[in-house]
Amino acid sequence: MALSSWIFFLLVHGIVGGSRTCFPGCRCIVDNFGLFHSFSLTKVDCSRVGPHVVPVSIPLDTSYLDLSSNRLKRINESVLSGPGYTTLMNLNLSYNQIVKISYSTFSKLRYLESLDLSHNLLETLPDGSFLYSRLTELDLSSNKIQKVGVGAFTLKSQGRSMTINLANNEIHSIFRGAERPVPNIHSLMLYGNQLLSVPDLHGIPLRHLNLDRNPLSKIEKVSFLGLESLTHLSLSDLPNLREVSPYSFKSLTSLLELDLSNNPNLKSLSSDMFFGLKALQELNLAYSGVASLPKDIMLHLPSMKSITWGENIRCLKTVKESIFHAQKGRVRKEVLLCHDDNGAVPAQDIL
């Protein structure tokens, strides 16, 4: 049984224990598990101790280490190795002043699943930065990163999918870099960066992608090719967005939710823009500049359930049956029923 699965089992059947002697300035909380408390894991909180805290010695059974808010400027392999680091699953290095990591910085943390490097001063990510870990959650938000190579997120064991947060950096380029296996990224947050176009993420098994608050001006026909697994796409708060090309979403056959809200300079949408969105259930166009939708929009959106529109208008799809016809029987027709805070809104005002 994998270590993480065993620990999860113990967490379900365990009870909280007490504290133990800890590194000066740190706090150690022990969780005891098992029928006779025969197994324990320790959470070590060394936040706000100061830069002298590293290297910090930690108990052998440490699963969580918090080194946030310590004004740390560098962190390396020697700091994150030794007794106690073998079982480490969660490491918090947020709110420091770390300017650089290397491909070997986290190489000894073979069971690391969650890493928080947010609110630091990182500018680059070396290829294979996290290669030897078992990461499922990686937070790199609010740094100074400008360019990102996809190879930085390749793991030696590719079986587990990752959630990666790169929000609020200065990213203007995402490139393929060295030949490595495509990283297994499930969710990618890129909001609040400097991307002028949708990056090439071809082949990455993404299900969630957030590109909000970037200076994108146009969605191209090829922008989302190779992202057939995508189910949630957010393109909100794009002040420069003026055009979505026809067939831009044609490869997104699994997409369930599309957010195009708060795009005031997006004035119109063609019916061909919705081509291929057979699974789409929710479309958000709230506070956009689009005055009306194509009349035949529902032909391209057979699974649509709701459209959010204008300032606070929501349209729900329903099936309406006409009067019985001698030859055709009852004819079923899909229609939109719309309402706002004041009540019903005629669908013809929207279509």
From Swiss-Prot:
Mapped LRR repeat ranges: 59-82, 85-108, 109-132, 134-155, 158-181, 182-203, 204-226, 252-276, 277-300
Primary location recorded for the protein, binned into one broad class: secreted
Signal peptide (residue range): 1-17
GO CC terms of this entry: extracellular matrix; extracellular space
Coiled coil, from the record: none
Tissue distribution of the protein: During embryogenesis, localized to the animal hemisphere during late blastula and gastrula stages. At stage 10, expression is also detected around the dorsal blastopore lip. Expressed in the mandibular crest segment, branchial crest segment and differentiating somites at stage 21/22. Expressed in the germ ring including the shield at shield stage and in the tailbud at the 10-somite stage.
Keywords, sorted A to Z: Developmental protein, Leucine-rich repeat, Neurogenesis, Repeat, Secreted, Signal
Description of the deletion phenotype: Morpholino knockdown causes anterior neural developmental defects. Morpholino knockdown impairs neural crest formation. Morpholino knockdown results in impaired endoderm formation and mesoderm patterning.
Gene Ontology terms: biological process: bone growth; energy homeostasis; nervous system development
PANTHER family recorded: SLIT RELATED LEUCINE-RICH REPEAT NEURONAL PROTEIN, TIR DOMAIN-CONTAINING PROTEIN
Function: Contributes to various developmental events through its interactions with multiple signaling pathways. Dorsalizing factor which functions as an inhibitor of bone morphogenetic proteins (BMP) during gastrulation. Promotes dll1-dependent activation of Notch signaling and is required for neural crest formation. Induces endoderm and dorsal mesoderm formation by enhancing nodal2/Xnr2 activity while inhibiting ventrolateral mesoderm formation through inhibition of fgf8.
Record note on quaternary structure: Interacts with bmp4. Interacts with dll1 (via extracellular region). Interacts with fgf8; inhibits fgf8 signaling. Interacts with nodal2/Xnr2; enhances nodal2 activity.
Note in the entry: This factor is named 'Tsukushi' because its expression pattern in chick embryos is similar to the shape of the Japanese horsetail plant, tsukushi.
Protein name per the record: Tsukushi-A
Species annotation: Xenopus laevis
Lineage: Eukaryota, Metazoa, Chordata, Craniata, Vertebrata
Gene (name only): tsku.L
